[in-house]
Design a protein with these regions (language model features):
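Glycine-rich phosphate/adenosyl-contacting loop at the front of the ribokinase-like
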Residues: 1-75
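Active-site metal-binding loops of divalent metal-dependent hydrolases
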Residues: 11, 136, 260
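Conserved beta-alpha-beta core of the PfkB/ribokinase-like small-molecule kinase fold
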Residues: 130, 135-208, 212-216, 222-226, ...
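Conserved N-terminal subdomain of the carbohydrate kinase-like
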Residues: 50-133
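Short glycine/proline- and charge-enriched loop/turn segments
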Residues: 19-27, 105, 239-246
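Conserved phosphate-binding/catalytic region of the ribokinase-like
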Residues: 3-6, 203-304
């Protein structure tokens, strides 16, 4: 039986600025499909490894746009739920001079808060190899409980769980420290960025992260590349590997680069790639992402 990949989490709309500067000074934005799990799902599809995607979309105009994008990318709608009484979450992006970004979220009464994983039955999970989840659905109930239920059932079915914390402090409505500790204890592969680590949610020491639960930790550092730190329980055994990344002279936007990296990691994990090969591939996918306007609805060549 062919083993599948399941990505689960939010899809939302990113508004990408047409110029650099503070949000209050930007005069024009472009609408783009986004949300870290949605970006990962689309990235995998563009790498010819189309996953299942479990999400909840509104039925407003933005929700219809997201559904259209997912359909265009060939992602099955079997686990795409609809919430007719909700709106689509919005994220406005602002860029500094170095192309880095900040997010301003509008997330009241939105569909992602109604995230529902009940449609993914245990029988489905028996055919799944890797389940990918993110941190945003952990920030609010009932989405938090739905995420944990899916992960618990996935582990019971023998799936590997890949987790990207995607820390957004302004979104938390439940205790972040307790939630993150529980999630780390259920994680096989963790992918984190410099921005995710530290504070009250995640330790900065890779060994502490491994002690918290994961067998493998991928730490990204933007254009400085990434590291993989793993213990004996990982597919690669115990060790540490590094890739220095790729120089990109024409960076347009870094939004979604981390999600592209995650897609590369999952693809390599499913393919059984060696650590050096996997890191090089994931860094290449992420680097290419920075050369186009961000999000799921950008140029399809981005992760090909």
């Amino acid at each position: 039986m062919t083993r599948e990949t399941l990505v689960a989490g939010e899809a939302l709309i990113d508004f990408i600025p047409g110029e650099r500067g503070a949000l209050a000074t930007v005069e024009a934005f472009s609408r783009q499909a986004g949300g870290a799990p949605a970006n990962v799902a689309v990235g995998l599809a563009r790498l010819n490894r189309t996953p299942w995607f479990c999400t909840t979309l509104a039925t407003d105009a933005f929700g219809e746009h997201l559904a259209t994008v997912l359909d265009r990318e060939g992602i099955p709608d079997r686990f795409v739920n609809r919430a007719p009484d909700a709106q689509t979450a919005l994220a406005f992006v602002s860029h500094g001079r170095d192309a880095d970004r900040e997010f301003t979220f509008y997330r009241q009464e939105t569909a992602d808060r109604q995230f529902d994983t009940s449609g993914v039955g245990d029988g489905v999970l028996e055919s799944v190899d890797v389940v990918v989840v993110g941190g945003v659905t952990l920030t609010v109930e009932p989405a938090r409980s739905e995420t944990f239920d899916l992960v618990e059932r996935a582990l019971a079915a023998g799936c590997r769980v890949c987790f990207d914390p995607n820390v957004r402090p302004e979104l938390w409505e439940v205790d972040p420290a307790t939630t993150m500790r529980r999630m780390l204890s259920m994680t096989d592969v963790l992918k984190g960025s410099r921005e995710d680590l530290g504070g009250d949610t995640l330790p900065t020491d890779p060994e502490e992260l491994l002690d918290a639960g994961p067998d493998a930790v991928f730490l990204t550092a933007g254009d400085a590349g990434a590291r993989l730190i793993a213990d004996e329980g990982s597919p690669w055994g115990r060790g540490e590997w590094r890739h220095d990344g790729y120089r990109v002279d024409d960076v347009v936007d870094t939004t979604g680069a981390g999600d592209a990296f995650t897609a590369g990691v999952v693809a390599g994990l499913v393919d059984g790639a060696a650590p050096e090969e996997l890191l090089g591939f994931a860094n290449a996918v992420a680097a290419e992402m920075t050369t186009t306007p961000a999000s799921s609805s950008s140029a399809t060549s981005r992760t090909s």
